[in-house]
């Protein structure tokens, strides 16, 4: 099985990439393991997503226990309850596509080998899947 993350860490031409990771605190041992993205839609815009950063911490612990290197990132979530009844409602449905696209971009750009997606509402769940 191909390990995509090797594209960003293996070989002398990837020394600058490794330097970026090391600037974030990763070790050579961390870089030798598969990279698993841990994405959440946690934010302070909606109550169903506000707790997700804490769940992401637990997911990262699980990734570490499984022998991989977690890489956390977040994406948006729009609250229908707050966006309702004004111009903001036009943003709600499209937010699913933005969530999906932003996750795909992060995974592709950083060559993550796997993804744990954590979401909490009717738009962020399908966008994350």
Short names for language-model regions:
Residues 1-129:
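Metallocofactor- and cofactor-centric catalytic cores in central/energy metabolism, strongly enriched
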